From Swiss-Prot:
This is C-8 sterol isomerase. Pathway: Steroid metabolism; ergosterol biosynthesis; ergosterol from zymosterol: step 2/5. The chain crosses the membrane at residues 40-60. GO terms for biological process: ergosterol biosynthetic process. Pfam families: ERG2_Sigma1R.
Amino acid sequence: MPPKKQSSSGGNKPSGSGSSSGRSSSGSSCRCSCRCRCSIGGWLKFFAILFALVAPIAYVLEQRLESFYVFDTEHLHDLSKRAISAHGNDTKAIVKYIVDELNDRNGVAPYVNNDEEWVFNNAGGAMGAMYIIHASITEYLIIFGTAIGTEGHTGRHTADDYFHILTGTQTAYVPGEYEPEVYPPGSVHHLVRGTVKQYRMPESCFALEYARGWIPPMLFFGYADTLSSTLDFPTLWRTSVITGREMISNLLKGKF
C-alpha cells in the first residue's frame, strides 16, 4: 500500500506564521513612530505657545529696563575713584568706604546688603571670592577679586558688566588684537552685553563689579564650573541662599 502524501498545508504553516509576525512587527514599528511624531509635535506646540506668551512680556519689560535700575554707573565710577584716593591700596577700607556711602544714598540704601558675606566664586575657569552688596532681577553689585591672581572667560551675558578696578590690575584680550587691554586702579572695564573676552588678574586684584540687564540667565554661568568641575556644593548652596535671599527681599520691596 503506497504511503500517504503529507498535506501541503502543514508545510505552509511556518511561512504563514512568519508573515504574520512580520506584519505584527511592522505594525508595532509604525505605531511607535507615530507616537514619537505626536510626542515631538506636542512639545513643539507647547514651546510655540510658551514663546507666544512670553515674547510680548519680555519685549515690554526690555523697553522699560532702564526704569528698574537704582544704581548709576557714573556715580559708581566716581565713588570708586574717591575711595581709592582716600585709602590707596587698603582694599578693606576701600570696600567699607563704598558700602558706607551707598547706605547714605537716597534710593539706594534700602537695597544694600550690609552683611559682608564672602564666598568663593568659580566661573569661566577663573576663581576668586565675592561679597554680594546687591542682587535683584535687573542689577547686581558685588566686590569680586583674589589675593593671588586668576584668569578665565568672561562669559557672554544678558547684562552690561562694569568692572571698577579698586586695587591691582586687570587685563583683557579680544581675538584679532595683538596687545592686551589694561585696566589699572580707578579705571572701568565695560563688558558690553552679549560680548565676550578673556580676562586676567595677574596678581592681587579686587573690583567693584556692577551688572545691569537681565541677571537670572547669568546664574547658569556662575553654576557651570561647580556642576562640571569643582563639585563644591556647600559653596554653591551658600551662594544660592545669599543670592536668592537678596533677590526675593528686593522684590518684596518693589525692586525688580
